[in-house]
A protein has these predicted regions:
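Fold-independent oxyanion-binding glycine-rich loops
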Residues: 39-41, 60-62, 132-133
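Short, well-ordered secondary-structure micro-motifs
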Residues: 48-49, 68-70, 78-79, 140-142, ...
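Glycine/Thr-rich phosphate-binding loops of Rossmann-like dinucleotide-binding domains
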Residues: 3-5, 66, 138
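Solvent-exposed alpha-helices and their adjacent loops that cap or buttress functional pockets
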Residues: 48-52, 57-60, 120-123
Length: 164
């Protein structure tokens, strides 16, 4: 989780040195240029959303990322990955790349559909964007209020982060 350029937690990186590390400040000092640091799902969302209503982004890659936006504005710090999902395991454990490899794309896609149902109940989103490196492996057709996005949305989101 990143807040105001500071990495609060990064359990997926496996090193305590990231805990409360001012990444934006460190990069700015070393590069001599202003920097912005965002969660990857937040950044992808900035490049994907339309700015209408409550929009949510989930990213499927090494783990499970989430971002939430209201009328085009990021509502930061939504971190669902480490919450319990099913069978005592977290969203990351059940939906991450290791789980996909273990059970295959079809079984993993069913899990993702259950997670989407959870996110719908939790947020009552108007639109959901699904991205990340493994989104292309999903085996179901999305509902009309769900859009699959490619990783270029993250690059676009990086540019959008500077518009505020």
């Amino acid at each position: 989780m990143v807040r105001d350029g500071v990495v609060l937690t990064a359990p997926n990186l496996g090193h305590e040195g990231w805990h409360r590390f001012d990444l934006a400040g460190s990069l700015t000092a070393r590069l001599g240029k202003p920097t912005r640091v965002l969660n990857d799902a937040d950044m992808q969302g900035l490049g994907a959303i339309r700015g209408r209503g409550l929009e949510m982004v989930i990213t499927l890659g090494t783990g499970f990322g989430t971002g939430l936006y209201l009328d085009g504005r990021l509502l930061p710090h939504l971190e669902i990955a480490h919450l319990r999902f099913r069978k005592g395991e977290t969203y990351d454990e059940r939906l991450g790349n290791a789980a996909r490899k273990k059970i295959g794309d079809k079984g993993w896609s069913r899990r993702v559909q259950k997670a989407i149902d959870d996110m719908r109940r939790l947020t009552n989103f108007d639109h959901l964007y699904v991205g990340g490196g493994n989104a292309k492996r999903l085996t179901f057709e999305p509902n009309p209020d769900i859009t699959f996005v490619d990783n270029e949305a993250g690059i676009d989101g990086g540019a959008h982060a500077w518009l505020d």
